Amino acid sequence: MDLNQFISIRRELHQIPETGYKEWKTQAYLLDYINKLPSRYLEVKKWRTGLLVRVSGTSPTKTIGYRTDIDALPITEETGLAFESKHAGNMHACGHDLHMSIALGVLTHFASKPAKDNLLFVFQPAEEGPGGAKPIMESAEFAEWRPDSIYGLHIAPEYKVGQIAIKPGLLFANTSELFISFKGKGGHAAYPHLANDMVVAASAFVGQMQTIISRNIDPMDSAVITIGRIHGGEIQNVIAETAFLDGTIRTLSPETMEIVWTRLKQLAKGWEEAYQCEVTFHAGSDYYQVDNDPAETAAFIDFLKESYPKSYVPAKSAMTGEDFGYFLSGIKGFMFWLGVDSEYSLHHAKLNPKEEAIPFAIEVLIHFLESK
């Protein structure tokens, strides 16, 4: 099998990025490819805009899962690549095009040369939001083929091609989207005493919420509150009746996440009194921590040291969010970082991963799964 063909597949997928639960063209592309594979050992199920593909083993005693995400981000691409996005305003800026092409490469191998045990390939939509891992896990389709272990990867611009970074235990943080609205009383800019200015209220709240991190969280622990978007008012000479804050909370434990949320809501009650306004929290996506199973991770590290001794890099815990954590909360397994050596970070409009990582990852995963 020519592994370089999956670089071409990546380029085709890169041109049709679609956001969460809108991945219809992506699903159709994947189905078209999978339907051309030898079908003797394959079974395929649709789940919303995603897919579940089972490869029957030759003498199975268990099912091994492999998950890839398939959605893109609402980002306007600025790479200038010949195969850049054809969907204006959308981009595979988090590497899910590489993730899919790698999964297809591994699937292609086992469709013709099945392993001893069953393999389940999960093509999951909506990782970037609103979160597809938890609902697909709760589906009847997944329950019927539920794996005994499950693995996944994520590209990492900061590592070189050929490097794989992993650690037992916590790899990625708990992440919660944060949406806060402030409603007060608008008015003329010349009469501030007759209004309740929500730009002032929201701005003050941004600063005050950071004291939660510095004064309510154990300094030996870690948490981050980030406000990435502020919007308030409509015109420069009118006091804003409403204001909105959008951001994220990231913690290294569910307990710390609970502390942050409790304090935020307590602050909000004080703000309602102090600024004579209404403060409302709106639910967003939650991402459970990616907690690698120690035994499964140790086995993979041993495999790397034996078969790819120059590839293994000890990873550190990161504040990155990934809903693969929901899989690992109920199924043993792990996720690892795959080096792609890009000067631009994940979610950057100029992210351009080195494609040599694709055949390398396919080879590693095939050999690892064959060793199971």
UniProtKB/Swiss-Prot annotation:
Keywords: Amino-acid biosynthesis, Diaminopimelate biosynthesis, Hydrolase, Lysine biosynthesis. SUPFAM superfamilies: Bacterial exopeptidase dimerisation domain, Zn-dependent exopeptidases. This is N-acetyldiaminopimelate deacetylase. Its EC number is 3.5.1.47. It catalyses: N-acetyl-(2S,6S)-2,6-diaminopimelate + H2O = (2S,6S)-2,6-diaminopimelate + acetate. One of its GO terms (biological process) is diaminopimelate biosynthetic process. One of its GO terms (molecular function) is N-acetyldiaminopimelate deacetylase activity. InterPro entries: AcetylDAP_deacetylase, Amidohydrolase, Bact_exopeptidase_dim_dom, Peptidase_M20, Peptidase_M20_dimer. Pathway: Amino-acid biosynthesis; L-lysine biosynthesis via DAP pathway; LL-2,6-diaminopimelate from (S)-tetrahydrodipicolinate (acetylase route): step 3/3. Catalyzes the conversion of N-acetyl-diaminopimelate to diaminopimelate and acetate. Belongs to the peptidase M20A family. N-acetyldiaminopimelate deacetylase subfamily. HAMAP family: DapEL (MF_01692). It comes from the Bacteria. The active site is at D69, E128 (proton acceptor). It holds the Pfam family Peptidase_M20.
